[in-house]
Amino acid sequence: STQAKTLFPYTTLFRSALDDDILLEIEKPARYIGGEVNAVMKNVEDIDVRFAMCFPDVYEIGMSHLGIQILYDMFNRREDVWCERVYSPWHDLDKVMREQKIPLFALESQDPIKDFDFLGITIQFEMCYTNILQILDLSQIPLHAKDRTLDDPFVIGGGPCTYNPEPIAEFFDLFYIGEGETAYDELLDAYKEWKGSGKSRREFLERAAQIEGLYVPIFYDAEYNEDGTLKSFTPNNEYASAVVKKQIVMDVTDAPYPMKPVVPFIKVTQDRVVLEIQRGCIRGCRFCQAGMLYRPVRERNVERLKQYAHDMLQNTGHEEISLSSLSSSDYSELKELVTYLIDEFKN
């Protein structure tokens, strides 16, 4: 309708990568059509960098992940970047896409992932490693980084599993070690400069390797002991650092946060407003990987969290709020925050 075109000038309502007969046959077709509330639409002709943000699991799991929402919002605040989402298709659509040779596509534009500049994959747990290969295979992107050309996107990995990236290093062009808010702007700016320069893919990776927190696997030689443990790990390129240091956001209060998170069409595992009240944990439990990775403890300002709650409820229509952290009971302003939220929103 005319009204729909006005509200969503570049919406996917009039275009789908999947035919109607496919959507009618598969389970939960809303996983694949895009167009949700707060999904960001842009004109491809007005941007310089296309970034596909991937959670390598089904839509219901990926849409519940706060980290994806944070980076999606942060990237799309830039006028020169369009960040879109992609998730692992369920078995039924996977089968159809292979049979009909339909390349995996982004939700917002419905364009093939292989046509993007970057494919960013968050790696939250080892059980999703096979899904990463599924994503690359369905996208028609060469599985191994060494086989990719200038026609392929750069594949970058992030998330907690990148602290031990070697098991999957051959499939990635680069990894980001640490919290994503710190260095992506520099990476995107470097890509824009490289894109029109006529330089090789390797030359861009050499530039990326100079950015703090970025690990480019092809620039390192790994040697292993007979039992499979790492024996040595040395750079083979002058631009690669001997040690890649994790990057952390010290001031989480002023870090980017999504005031308009995407609201899914279907029920997902965490279907509510999420307030990240702190990062890190004071407990130091030896069995907890996250408690070690996300040190030190950094708290968000309680007054800022109160405002976030107002804005996010208004922008989403959600009726529930969850307080997210590794140990929310250790948040120093917990009593004040919870009391305020109960009193303010009880009706």
Residue ranges and their predicted role:
Residues M53-C54, Q307-N347:
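Conserved SAM/AdoMet-binding glycine-rich loop
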Residues P89-P235:
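Glycine-rich beta-alpha loop elements in corrinoid/cobalamin-binding modules
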Residues S1-L13:
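Short, small-residue-biased leader/transition segments that mark boundaries at the very start
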Residues T12, D173, V263:
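Active-site loops and adjacent core secondary-structure elements that bind or stabilize anionic groups
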Residues F14-K28, R78:
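Helix-enriched interaction subdomains in cytosolic or periplasmic regions
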Residues I22-A52, Y59-E60, P217, E223-V274:
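N-terminal [4Fe-4S]-dependent radical SAM core
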Residues E79-D92:
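A short beta-strand-loop structural module common to alpha/beta enzyme folds
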